[in-house]
Every structure is written in structure tokens, then in C-alpha cells.
Amino acid sequence: MRALFIAAAAAAVLIAVRPAQAQAIPDLNVDPVCHGIAQQAADPSEKGGPDLAFSKCVQSEQAMRQKLVNEWSTFLPTEKSNCIGEQMGGMASYTDLVSCLEMAKDARQLNQGK
């Protein structure tokens, strides 16, 4: 009985913590997705090659993070929580996170217009 109580208490804490975490802009490791993009980039013998593609990808992701900082307050906590949860399952990308949040906000605004 005590173990059941402890498990229920732990679950309640985890449920309460998740929305709170969604209020902060996550620090995503974009290196894996950028390495993947760079590997698909131009042949190393071509001008720039994968090294340039990687650095441009990282720069682009940081620009998207800054866009997220500027727009963060326009998204609902549930939108943030859902979209951040999607980023934790695979290769994290601020570009994908911004896209998810913008689609969620657009859907909300369409529903409010009905």
C-alpha cells in the first residue's frame, strides 16, 4: 500500500513539473541534426563542403532560437508543452519547434474565429 502511495505521489509530481518546464525555452542540442544535414550536403571536394553546411545550419538554428525568444509569450502553455515534447523524441531542431508552435497557434486562432 505504501509503494502505491509513493508511486502515485511521484506521478503527480511529474505531471505538475512538465507544464512548468514548458514555460522555459528549451536548450536544444542541434549538433546531431546539423551533422545529419551536413552529411547530405555538397561533396567535400566542392567549395565549402560539409563543414560550411554544418556551421550554416547551426547559425540558422540559433537564428530560429532568437525568433522563438521574441515570440515565446504568444504561445499557450499547452502548445509549448506539446511541441517541446515532440522535440524530445528525436533530433531536436529550433526550426521544427517554431514550426510546431506556429501551426498550433494558427489552429487556435482559426478555431477562435468560428
Predicted regions and their residues:
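Classic N-terminal secretory signal peptides
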Residues: 1-21
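Mitochondrial intermembrane space
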Residues: 18-114
